[in-house]
Amino acid sequence: MAAEKPLIMMMAGGTGGHVYPALAVAAELLSRGYRVEWIGTARGLEHRVVPAAGITLHCLSVRGVRGKSVLDKIRAALFLIIALLQALWLVLRRGPRCVVGMGGYVSGPAGVAAWMLRKPLVIHEQNAVAGTTNRLLAPLASCVFAGFPGAFDHNIHYTVLGNPVRRELLEASADRLYDYAGQRPLRLLVVGGSLGARPINDVIPGAIKRLIEGGNTSIEVWHQTGEGHDDVVRQAYGALLDRGIRVAPYIEDMAEAYSWADLVLCRCGALTITELCIMGRPAILVPLPHAIDDHQTANARVLTDCGGATQLCQRDMDEHSVLSLLQDFLGNPQRLSTMAAAAFAAAIPDAAEHVSNCCEELMYA
């Protein structure tokens, strides 16, 4: 009987921007026959989606430190010490051959534990500006990867290989043909993030109303509002819901949504930028102005610099500015085709494979 393949532990937590790329790497490793377990928390998205993927989740007692009161920081430091002890015991007990960190504060104590116990440590930074945890772990890691150039300081040796994405998106990308040329209604996908984005929800329905009332009915909208915001947005669209407008709190199948869309209006999370490139979709990007280290603006530059998107600052976003952009695109469909091609040219589709290859090289070196 063939020997059981080694165990690899994933570390990622908090938001989908960390968890979903880690799931993509985990899926690749599982497809190669490796055992995969996960270090996370009971508070983040991983607590729901990791067990649903059939992967064992080990939870640490750790909390974020940044942006809190002094008392919260003291508590977080105590939790950090406890989490480090938990991580040391977990890594000793489970004995992984390699540990992969994909961001989120849970990666901190688990990554330090892996380093202390001389386990190969691989880290991947999704954003164009590295987060605190990955900046601290980078000098300890055996391999450092980034989704975009410029994520780390020049004194850190790292490789840019894109962000891992779910397999269904890669499969949809093979059929990503961009066919909008103005002969049918423009399909606008509005995505404010999994938790929604109130400024986007407040502005878009009014802009669409003004567009249609001005005589331009050649548009369809699929609007993700975020949980708990869909009723208000439906009321804002009103009678337009019978004229090609769809509203949903959350879109489960983003591959279908991107395939449907001719233009996407969205925030600038690292995973969103990567998915736009993989699917070759032009975008209006609205960076979250208060994101830590302003990383969403840096993420947006990846697409705006190559011509795959246009950026709209939140402070400048109102019904008039959105209406003006939509009118420009409707009047110049060739511009959208050019942007779509530029976005797709920036795609790096095989990041999960590269991270998995690195794990294998470290384990069998």
Where are these regions (language model features)?
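C-terminal alpha-helical cap of glycosyltransferases
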Residues: 348-365
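Conserved donor-binding/catalytic loop of nucleotide-activated donor transferases
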Residues: 117, 259-261, 277-286, 306
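Active-site-proximal region of nucleotide-activated glycan assembly enzymes
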Residues: 35, 45, 56, 115-175
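Donor-nucleotide binding loops and adjacent catalytic segments primarily
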Residues: 44, 49, 53, 174-264, ...
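Glycosyltransferases and closely related glycan-assembly transferases
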Residues: 86-100, 107-122, 135-140
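Acidic donor-binding loop of glycosyltransferase active sites
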Residues: 96-98, 259-274, 281
